[in-house]
C-alpha cells in the first residue's frame, strides 16, 4: 500500500513538473513601438510562420475576417488621436482585423473589443475605423509575420505588415500641434 502511494506521489510530482515547463510557442509574441509626433503607436501581435503553406486565399481565406496574426487578436495602441490613411482614429487600444477581399483589395479594421482570441467573437458594431488598402508584392518573402515602421518623419510613419509574399502599408499621421497645446495647458 505504501509503495502504491509513493509511486502515485512520484508520478504526480513528475506530471506537475512537466506541466510547469515553458516551451517555445509556434507563433511567438512580438511588439513594435514607434513615436510619431508626440504619441507612441504600439503593435502587439503573435508571429505565425508560413511553414510551406499557401497563406493568402488558403490559410487566410479571401473575403473572411482574420485576426492579423495568431492567438489573441493583434493589438494597436495609440496614446493620442492619429490619422490612418487620412481617417481619424481616436487614442485608445484596438484589435486589428483584416479582410483580404481579393488579391488587390484588403479592408483593415480597428475594433474596440480588445480581448478577443482570434476572430470568432468579432462584432462589426464595435468597429471604430475601416480603411481599404492595396497589398503589394514583397521584395523578399517573409517566413514569420512581421509588423514594422518605415518612412518615419516628425509627424508621420508607415506601418508595414509583411508575411509570405505580400506587404501591406498603412500611412499614419499624428498632429503634434494639438498635443503641444494640451501639454502647455497641463503644465
Regions found by a protein language model. Name each.
Residues 87-90, 122:
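Short glycine/proline-enriched turns and hinge-like loops at secondary-structure junctions
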Residues 1-24:
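Bacterial Sec-dependent N-terminal signal peptides
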Residues 78, 110-112:
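Peptidyl-prolyl cis-trans isomerase
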Residues 21-64, 113-186:
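Primarily secretory-pathway and cell-envelope proteins
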Residues 97-100, 104-108, 115-119:
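Covalent nucleotidyltransferase core used to form phosphodiester bonds in nucleic acids
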Residues 89-98:
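A short tyrosine-centered beta-strand micro-motif
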Residues 72-87:
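Conserved interaction-surface patches within small, structured recognition/assembly domains
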Residues 66-67, 78:
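Pre-active-site segment of Zn-dependent metallo-hydrolases
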Amino acid at each position: 500500500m505504501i509503495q502504491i502511494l509513493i509511486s502515485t506521489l512520484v508520478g504526480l510530482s513528475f506530471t506537475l513538473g512537466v506541466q510547469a515547463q515553458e516551451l517555445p510557442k509556434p507563433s511567438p509574441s512580438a511588439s513594435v513601438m514607434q513615436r510619431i509626433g508626440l504619441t507612441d503607436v504600439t503593435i502587439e501581435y503573435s508571429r505565425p510562420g508560413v511553414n510551406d503553406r499557401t497563406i493568402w486565399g488558403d490559410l487566410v481565406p479571401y473575403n473572411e475576417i482574420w485576426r492579423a496574426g495568431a492567438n489573441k487578436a493583434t493589438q494597436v495602441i495609440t496614446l493620442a488621436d492619429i490619422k490612418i490613411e487620412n481617417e481619424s482614429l481616436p487614442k485608445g487600444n484596438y484589435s486589428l482585423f483584416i479582410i483580404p477581399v481579393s488579391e488587390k483589395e484588403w479592408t483593415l479594421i480597428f475594433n474596440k473589443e480588445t480581448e478577443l482570441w482570434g476572430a470568432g467573437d468579432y462584432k462589426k458594431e464595435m468597429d471604430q475605423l475601416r480603411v481599404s488598402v492595396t497589398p503589394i508584392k514583397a521584395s523578399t518573402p517573409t517566413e514569420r509575420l512581421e509588423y514594422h515602421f518605415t518612412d518615419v518623419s516628425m509627424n508621420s510613419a508607415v506601418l508595414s505588415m509583411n508575411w509570405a509574399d505580400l506587404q501591406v502599408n498603412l500611412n499614419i499621421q499624428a498632429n503634434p500641434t494639438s498635443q503641444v497645446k494640451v501639454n502647455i495647458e497641463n503644465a
